[in-house]
Amino acid sequence: MTTVIDGKNVAASVIETVKSATSALESETGVRAGLAVVIVGDDPASHTYVSAKSRMAKECGFLSVQHTLPEETSQEELAALVAELNADPSIHGILVQLPLPKHLRSEPIIQSILPEKDVDGLHVVNAGKLATGDLEGGLVSCTPAGAMVFVRRTYGDDLSGLNAVVIGRSNLFGKPMSALLLAANATVTTAHSRTKDLAAVCRNADILVAAVGRPEMVKADWVKPGAMVVDVGINRVPAPERGEGRTKLVGDVAFDECAKVAGVITPVPGGVGPMTIAMLMANTIIAACRMAGRKPPKF
């Protein structure tokens, strides 16, 4: 029987751990974890995401601060706000919602966030710590961190002897995911658009992670029987069966056919997606614990 992972359930258990660690930190040290979210402009999708993040931060018991800046905010004004948040001892996590309006350069802003407050895990210092296997010192990008919770709950902490294939080499997901699997002792192949005979490479995987943004690219005959398949893709495709002009969300994996072969699989939606915000909260309490000199919780 194939196990279909319920991402909402796993995310809820992560949030429970965050809540108890947050109240323990506050009762033992008087420190309340603080998350600042910065949004520039009025992109509706970004505002939806930010509201969800702020709401979840409050639910976790954090000090939740939202800075909404007008579309015409200058690079200097945004940089000044980040500098202010860097210097604020009540803020342990800083998140700048991307994408920024076209006239702003996101990279200098992201790299100006203190690495220890970079709860999105996008600072080069955090990327470097992950690449060198320093998982105790850095903060890991939220989506790969969330996918890794699924892997650990399936196989445990030590992946010795297991082959993992990550399709996708983006800085946001593919590279950090490969690094996390490697740090857990898996034998890792990072595949991408230039990989020769991708299906054959995938068939060797005990853990197959797809993150390329190509709807239902991974077919059943790419999957080793009994393997774990983690689908990170999120693609909107036409759904004429739902009526004219209707669409639906699908992943990078042809779910129905792959679910017949895989041992464990994540659906889209409802798989990796809910984990992203949960791991943002996890990173915030980890950052707060470290700054207070306490041992952070494990996820």
Curated annotation (Swiss-Prot):
Q: Which PROSITE patterns match?
A: THF_DHG_CYH_2
Catalysed reaction(s)? (6R)-5,10-methylene-5,6,7,8-tetrahydrofolate + NADP(+) = (6R)-5,10-methenyltetrahydrofolate + NADPH; (6R)-5,10-methenyltetrahydrofolate + H2O = (6R)-10-formyltetrahydrofolate + H(+)
Instruction: Could you list this entry's UniProt keywords, alphabetically sorted.
Output: Amino-acid biosynthesis, Histidine biosynthesis, Hydrolase, Methionine biosynthesis, Multifunctional enzyme, NADP, One-carbon metabolism, Oxidoreductase, Purine biosynthesis
Recorded GO terms, molecular function?
A: methenyltetrahydrofolate cyclohydrolase activity; methylenetetrahydrofolate dehydrogenase (NADP+) activity
This protein's assembly is summarised as: Homodimer.
Tell me which family the UniProt entry assigns to this protein: Belongs to the tetrahydrofolate dehydrogenase/cyclohydrolase family.
Task: Please identify the protein, giving its name as recorded.
Answer: Bifunctional protein FolD 2
